[in-house]
Structure formats: C-alpha cells, structure tokens
Amino acid sequence: GMGGQSLRTIRNTEVRHLEEETKISQELIDSLKDSNRAVPIVGYQILGVAPQEYKIGNGLIVEPVGVQTDHIEARFLNIIAHKNMKENISQCCDSVPIEIAEDADDLIAPLALADAVLTPGEKRSGCVLVDFGAGTTTVSIYKNNILRHLAVIPLGGNNITKDICSQQIEEEDAEALKIRFAQAYIEPKENDDESKMYNLDGRCSINAILLEDIVEARLNEILDNVSNQIVLSGYENKLMAGAIITG
C-alpha cells in the first residue's frame, strides 16, 4: 500500500444553495463529492476521501439523502500525497507486472492497517492508531467510524539506531543492541548501577544507563509529535477507546 512522509489529510468543504427546499438526492451528494475531488492541490494528488458529515440547518448528519433543505454543507477529509507517488507505484507494478486495486482507498497503507487492527467499537468510540515504523510513525485518528485525521511523522526506529551509532558503534551492532536491550519504559530505581554495561557477544558494549537515556529521549520526541497530531486533529478529548499501538 501507499505510505510515506508526504501522506497526510486536509479538510475541505463544499456548499450548495438550492433555489427552494428540496429533498436531497444521491445525485446531489455525488456532485458534491466530485467537486471535492476536483479541488486542485499544488504538488499533491488526492488518493482517497473520507466524507465527514453534512451540515443541514444547525445539525450535522452522516446520511443526508432524503432530508429536506435549501442549503447543504458537505465536509470532507482528503487523503493526499505527492503527485508522483501513485505514478511511481503504478510504473513499478507495470514492470513486474502486478495488478493494482482500482479503488485508490485500497492502496492507502494506513487505512488497510486500521481495517485489520481496529475493532468497529474502537473506531466508533474514538481512538488513535499509532504505527511505529523504521523511518516514520503514522498517526490515524477515528471517531464515529470515520477517519478524522492522518499524519506521517518522519521519525521512527531507525532514528534510535542512529542515536546509538553516535557512540562510535557500527550500525549493525547498534540495531542489535536496540533490539536486545532497549526498552520503551524502565521503572526508576534509587540505586542504579552506573557501571552496568550491555554487551553484544563481545563485539561491542554500551553503558546501560546511557542506552536507556538515548532510547527515552528519542521516544519522547516521537511521542510528543504524536501528541501534537492528536491536538491538531481537534479530537484530543474525544477518543474514548484510547491509543492502539502497532509496528
């Protein structure tokens, strides 16, 4: 599926003023969706769309077909990425050849992951799915069974490895030290042994407290960015199902 640092979501609103109070038809909804898809975004391409709600009068509804109104405001969340991303993937598949899905939504990796990992209850109650990768961390936020926000943070496990490398350790050994000894959280102790070393089969070693500090610092940076994305989404106090972590 399609992922990467350029993948993110932006909001858009399409409005229709009707000459008289009319029952909303599926054709009108399709027209609003087409207008949203046609909005130009310089340097980017719309890969998928998550309709949010439709504002009719003072209310917000998800299924507006059949409702009487003379004014409708459609709110969309567009999933975008650099223009050449889909083209590059298509060219790679053509050269193999591999048949790709016709529905672009099926190609968006975070959406496919959410469908595989999250329960309907979690999506309905509201949750944030955090996917820790090697080079990136992807944040997907759901509420009322609708994708509300998606962002890719350009930080991941590789950054921790590089931080360990800064201690004059080869990358392969740094990765092995991370996998074998690193922990996301360590219970504070009053009498930590400052001389304790983590040894990698005699090839290299690192002070245990130093490794813990390196990992903690980078993870705090990543989690601060995740927290910031939750705030930017506007749903920080509405995620009753909490956070689901994968990666």
Specify the residue positions occupied by each region the protein language model found.
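Active-site lining segments that contact anionic ligands and/or coordinate catalytic metals
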Residues: 136, 226, 238-242
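Residue-level signature of catalytic and energy-coupling elements of molecular machines
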Residues: 93, 131, 164, 226, ...
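A conserved active-site cap/scaffold subdomain adjacent to cofactor or substrate pockets
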Residues: 154-170
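Feature representing long, continuous alpha-helical segments
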Residues: 162, 209, 213, 217-224, ...
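Nucleotide/phosphate-binding catalytic cleft detector across ATP-hydrolyzing
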Residues: 2-128, 146-148, 170-171, 182-212, ...
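Small-residue helix-packing motif on alpha-helices
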Residues: 174-177
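Residue-level detector of high-confidence beta-strand sites
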Residues: 150-152
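A short acidic Gly-Thr/Ser loop motif
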Residues: 1-3, 129-136, 142-143, 154-158, ...
